[in-house]
Regions:
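Active-site-adjacent loops and short helices of periplasmic peptidoglycan-processing enzymes
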Residues: 1-136, 145-146
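Domain-terminus/edge residues, biased toward the C-terminal soluble/receptor-binding domains
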Residues: 115-119, 127-189
């Protein structure tokens, strides 16, 4: 039966979610931006500077500083190569210049979805002792995300080229990439 747990181990143990955080960031972005294809979001150097020297995975959003990117391009930039830069730009935009406002929305949504052991401290998943979730809570978050527009489409994308870019973004999800996934590739993922 769909939705039935087949096996679980330590489903309620707190863990650091790392880049799976971006699933909640996706949720908040899609729920707060009405027109993903036409909403232009300014790319500010000050937002990207926060990620310097963090070892962050990036999606080359910096190439657009001083210009704008569409919300949909930023969502692909966040989800396909796990771009922390795109996550921060979306959070800054929706939080009206304050990423903490965005993180508050993330935590409110987690509660609304019935998450009992989740607390977010940032939109990108960089380590913070106060940034945690459980497998059970992440299941609730992901199950909800799958009901939202374009989530499945974006997360099943292996390469994507943003408007105005020459270089394609490449997925970090080896489960779906037959060319780069090697032993991790799973054709039914």
């Amino acid at each position: 039966r769909q939705g039935q747990t087949v096996y679980e181990k330590d489903a309620d143990s707190k863990r650091y979610p790392a880049s799976t955080t971006k699933i909640m960031t996706y949720i908040i972005a899609v729920e707060n931006i009405a027109d993903l294809d036409n909403t232009k979001i300014p790319i500010k150097q000050s937002v990207l500077d926060v990620l310097k020297n963090t070892g962050s995975s990036l999606a080359n959003v910096e190439n657009h500083v001083g210009k704008s990117m569409t919300a949909i391009d930023l969502l692909y930039s966040m989800m396909v190569p796990s771009g922390n830069d795109a996550a921060m730009v979306l959070a800054d935009y929706i939080g009206e210049g304050n990423v903490d406002n965005f993180v508050k929305l993330m935590n409110e949504k987690a509660k609304e979805l019935g998450c009992e052991n989740t607390h977010f401290a940032n939109p990108d998943g960089l380590h913070d002792p106060d940034h945690y979730t459980t497998a059970r809570d992440m299941y609730k978050i992901t199950t909800y995300a799958l009901t939202l527009p374009r989530f499945e489409e974006i997360t099943n994308t292996c390469t994507y080229t943003c408007d105005g870019d020459d270089t394609a973004l490449v997925t970090t999800n080896y489960l779906i990439d037959a060319n780069r996934g090697g032993e991790y590739y799973y054709m039914y993922a």
